[in-house]
Amino acid sequence: MAYSKIRQPKLSDVIEQQLEFLILEGTLRPGEKLPPERELAKQFDVSRPSLREAIQRLEAKGLLLRRQGGGTFVQSSLWQSFSDPLVELLSDHPESQFDLLETRHALEGIAAYYAALRSTDEDKDRIRELHHAIELAQESGDLDAESEAVLQYQIAVTEAAHNVVLLHLLRCMEPMLAQNVRQNFELLYARREMLPLVSTHRTRIFEAIMAGKPEEAREASHRHLAFIEEIMLDRSREESRRERALRRLEQRKN
């Protein structure tokens, strides 16, 4: 009986696959700088030429970017599928924000569910840290800081779900999500009596994730976004009433 020769994988191929996996699962984040070549070769326990070959191939694939004298970075444009013009277009059509909220219902509910089910101690530490950052920003009345903390909190929850497709969907949506969160906070800061209720909703999501209760986390996420949607609808109705009143006033003048 003839046996085929077992081919050992090329070392640079193994390194390439490992780095690809770290990018895919989100361990290496967009824009993140890789350790220096010498240090990275030591961590992988490989030769520098093999590492260099793997990095060159990942650079050719568009996953890494090497800057002369500045190191090697994960491409920051990997998840920027929704371009600035599209974000601007959506902002010019307020009704699209309701479509985005519906999408957030689905994605954030799933993320909260699986974060409660799968989050590690390190994931929970990160989520806890960002939840506290949101509280501090709200206490100081810093709209910009609170909007950014909420965005980073949602990214951390999605990372804790350990679903690479879900994470990369969120990364693609990040510019739109950032704008939506910001607009929602502008509305909430104009109706400050609503802020404590929003905080209560978010705390329920946080506590369910920390307690490992996936169904409660998902339901709390849905209730939170439904509340935001209701506030947006109230504003839309108020604006419609104001426009009708102005039209009547103009008619009387004429």
Curated annotation (Swiss-Prot):
Transcriptional repressor for the pyruvate dehydrogenase complex genes aceEF and lpd. Residues 37-56 bind DNA. CDD domains: WHTH_GntR. It comes from Salmonella typhimurium (strain LT2 / SGSC1412 / ATCC 700720). The gene is pdhR. This is Pyruvate dehydrogenase complex repressor. Keywords: DNA-binding, Repressor, Transcription, Transcription regulation. Residues 9-77 form the HTH gntR-type domain. The keyword Transcription regulation applies. The lineage of its organism: Bacteria, Pseudomonadati, Pseudomonadota, Gammaproteobacteria, Enterobacterales.
